[in-house]
C-alpha cells in the first residue's frame, strides 16, 4: 500500500519494519519482472532489428527490381512504339494492296464479262459455221457425185466416139483399094473423089477436130480435178499442222469453211466447163447430123 512520508514517520518500529520488508519484496518482484520484461523487450528489439534488416534488404531488392522494371518498361515502350509504327506501315501497305486488288478484281470482272460475251458470240459463230460446214459438205458430196457421173458419162461418150470413128474408118479402108485401081472404064466417072466421098471425108475431118477439141477439154478438166484434189490434200495437211500447233477452234473452223467454199467454187467451175463442153459437143453432133442429112 502507498503511505505518505509523515505516515511512515509516525509508524512504530515493527510496522515500519514490516512495511520495509513488504516494499523490499515488491522491489524484488519488480526487479524480477523488469528483468523479464527487459529480456522480452531485448528479444523483441532483436526481432524488430532482424525484421528491419530484412525489410531494408527487401526494400533494396524492390528498388533494384523497380529500376529493372522501369528499364524494361522503357525498352518495352520503345519496342512497342517501333512495332506500332511498323504495323501502321504494314497496315497502310495492306490497305493499298487491298485497293489495288479491288481494282484488279473490278477489271477482271469487266474482262470476264467481255470474255463471256465473246464466248457466247464464238459459240453462236461456231454453231453457224457448223451449219455452213454441214451444208458445204453436203454440197461437196452432191457435186462429187455429179462430177463422178459426168466423168462416167464423158468416158462413155469418149468410148462411143472411138467406136464411131472406128466404124467410119472401116468404109474408107474398103474404098481405098478401089481408088488405087489404075483401070478406068469409059462409062465410069473420073477417078477423082465424088461429092459424097468428099462430103464424107470433110465430115470425118470435122469429127476428128471436134473429137480432138473435146479430148483436150477433157484432159484440161481432169487436170483441174487433179489440181483440186492436190490442193485439198495440201489444205488438209495445213489444217492438221495448224491444229497441231494449237490455234483457236474458231480460226480452224473459219479456215475449214473457207477451204470448203473454195473447193465448192472450183467444183462448180469445173462442172460448168463440163456442161459447156457437153453442150458444145451436143451442138456439134447436131450440126453433123444436119450436115449429113
Swiss-Prot record:
Q: Which residues form a coiled coil?
A: 36-147
Cellular component annotations (GO), alphabetically ordered: centrosome; kinesin complex; kinetochore; microtubule associated complex; nuclear envelope; synapse
Q: Report the function annotation for this chain.
A: Part of a complex with lis-1, which is recruited to the nuclear envelope by unc-83, where, in turn, it recruits dynein to the nuclear surface and regulates nuclear migration in hypodermal precursor cells. Plays a role in GABAergic synaptic vesicle localization in the ventral nerve cord.
Coarse class of the primary localization is: nucleus
Q: Name one GO biological process term.
A: centrosome localization
Q: What is this protein called?
A: Protein nud-2
Instruction: Give the keywords, sorted.
Output: Coiled coil, Nucleus
| Record organism | Caenorhabditis elegans
InterPro entries in UniProt: NUDE
Q: Where is this region: Required for interaction with unc-83 isoform c?
A: 239-293
Task: Tell me which tissues or organs this protein is expressed in.
Answer: Expressed in ventral cord neurons, the pharynx, seam cells of the hypodermis and in vulval muscle cells.
Q: What happens when the gene is disrupted?
A: RNAi-mediated knockdown results in viable animals, but a small, but significant number of animals have nuclear migration defects in hyp7 hypodermal precursor cells. RNAi-mediated knockdown results in an abnormal distribution of GABAergic synaptic vesicles at synaptic termini of the ventral nerve cord. RNAi-mediated knockdown in combination with exposure to pentylenetetrazole, a GABA antagonist that induces seizures, results in impaired locomotion, stiffened appearance and an increased convulsion incidence as compared to wild-type animals.
Q: Which family does it belong to?
A: Belongs to the nudE family.
Please name the taxonomic classification of the source. Answer: Eukaryota, Metazoa, Ecdysozoa, Nematoda, Chromadorea
Name where it's found: Nucleus envelope
Q: How does it assemble?
A: Component of a dynein-regulating complex composed of at least lis-1 and nud-2. Interacts with lis-1; the interaction is direct. Interacts (via C-terminus) with unc-83; the interaction is direct, and is required for recruitment of nud-2 to the nuclear envelope.
Which GO molecular function, any one, fits this protein according to its record?
Answer: microtubule binding
Amino acid at each position: 500500500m502507498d503511505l505518505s512520508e509523515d505516515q511512515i514517520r509516525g509508524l512504530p518500529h515493527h510496522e515500519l519494519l514490516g512495511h520495509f520488508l513488504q516494499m523490499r519484496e515488491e522491489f524484488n518482484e519488480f526487479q524480477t519482472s523488469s528483468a523479464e520484461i527487459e529480456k522480452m523487450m531485448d528479444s523483441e528489439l532483436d526481432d524488430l532489428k532482424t525484421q528491419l534488416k530484412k525489410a531494408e534488404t527487401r526494400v533494396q531488392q524492390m528498388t533494384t527490381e523497380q529500376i529493372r522494371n522501369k528499364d524494361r518498361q522503357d525498352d518495352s515502350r520503345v519496342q512497342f512504339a517501333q512495332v506500332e509504327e511498323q504495323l501502321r506501315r504494314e497496315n497502310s501497305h495492306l490497305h493499298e494492296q487491298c485497293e489495288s486488288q479491288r481494282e484488279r478484281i473490278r477489271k477482271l470482272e469487266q474482262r470476264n464479262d467481255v470474255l463471256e460475251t465473246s464466248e457466247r458470240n464464238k459459240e453462236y459463230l461456231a454453231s453457224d459455221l457448223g451449219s455452213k460446214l454441214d451444208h458445204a459438205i453436203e454440197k461437196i458430196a452432191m457435186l462429187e457425185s455429179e462430177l463422178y457421173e459426168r466423168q462416167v458419162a464423158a468416158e462413155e461418150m469418149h468410148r462411143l466416139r472411138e467406136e464411131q470413128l472406128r466404124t467410119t474408118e472401116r468404109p474408107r479402108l474398103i474404098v481405098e483399094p478401089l481408088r488405087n485401081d489404075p483401070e478406068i472404064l469409059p462409062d465410069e466417072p473420073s477417078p477423082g473423089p465424088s461429092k459424097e466421098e468428099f462430103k464424107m471425108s470433110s465430115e470425118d475431118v470435122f469429127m476428128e477436130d471436134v473429137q480432138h477439141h473435146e479430148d483436150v477439154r477433157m484432159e484440161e478438166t481432169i487436170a483441174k480435178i487433179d489440181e483440186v484434189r492436190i490442193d485439198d490434200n495440201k489444205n488438209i495437211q495445213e489444217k492438221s499442222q495448224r491444229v497441231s500447233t494449237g490455234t483457236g477452234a474458231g480460226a480452224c473452223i473459219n479456215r475449214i469453211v473457207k477451204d470448203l467454199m473454195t473447193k465448192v467454187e472450183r467444183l462448180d467451175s469445173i462442172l460448168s466447163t463440163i456442161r459447156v463442153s457437153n453442150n458444145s459437143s451436143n451442138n456439134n453432133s447436131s450440126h453433123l447430123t444436119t450436115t449429113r442429112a
